[in-house]
Amino acid sequence: MAFILGSGSPRRLELLAQLGVTPDDIRPPDIDETPQKGELPRDYCARVTRQKAEAVTSNPEDLVLCADTTVVLGRRIMGKPRDAGEAAEFLLALSGRRHRVITSVALRKQDRLWQKDVVSQVKMKRLSDEELNAYLATGDWEGKAGGYAIQGPAGALIPWISGSFTAIVGLPLAETATLLQTAGYPLYKDTAS
């Protein structure tokens, strides 16, 4: 049985390492992540994660783990910004407000799929022009849902969260561990030999 991480995210790889898990292979799927018309944010996140898990090629005995993280303000899905201008637009919309971060994680083995969605609340402080421009200049917004990463410089902009910190980063560890154990992955195998 091979364990395949269906994600190119270095953050997910680092989070898996906290569980003592090293993927045998990394195969980021290439799927269309465009929200469907009228699709609710949690449904969108779950669908994209499921499609990612189904898109990764694997052998029948392999385990494939995929996840998707979505930043949501009201019903607005904030994906990865195309450029600094869109990142600024996202951050200004989030400034001084609470929003949701939804992370869906899926584990597939053959035709079996285990999936869990985790919804966390995040409050971003009211950003001054100086803070916004300084953060944009770091480039840390690139490739990040909502235009920020809580585990980087943007952590200074987040005074409050409710939920799972690791889910906000990109992979809810408690839920991921449960999925791995449910699928028979030897998560806490004896390493003292």
Swiss-Prot record:
It is found in: Cytoplasm. It comes from the Bacteria. The keyword Cytoplasm applies. GO terms for molecular function: dTTP diphosphatase activity; UTP diphosphatase activity. InterPro entries: ITPase-like_fam, Maf-like. The record marks R11, T69, Q151 as: Important for substrate specificity. It catalyses: dTTP + H2O = dTMP + diphosphate + H(+); UTP + H2O = UMP + diphosphate + H(+). Its EC number is 3.6.1.9. Its cofactor is a divalent metal cation. GO terms for biological process: nucleotide metabolic process. GO terms for cellular component: cytoplasm. Signal peptide: none annotated. It is an enzyme of class 3 (hydrolase). Keywords: Cytoplasm, Hydrolase, Nucleotide metabolism, Plasmid. The active site is at D68. NCBIfam families: maf. Nucleoside triphosphate pyrophosphatase that hydrolyzes dTTP and UTP. May have a dual role in cell division arrest and in preventing the incorporation of modified nucleotides into cellular nucleic acids. Belongs to the Maf family. YhdE subfamily. This is dTTP/UTP pyrophosphatase.
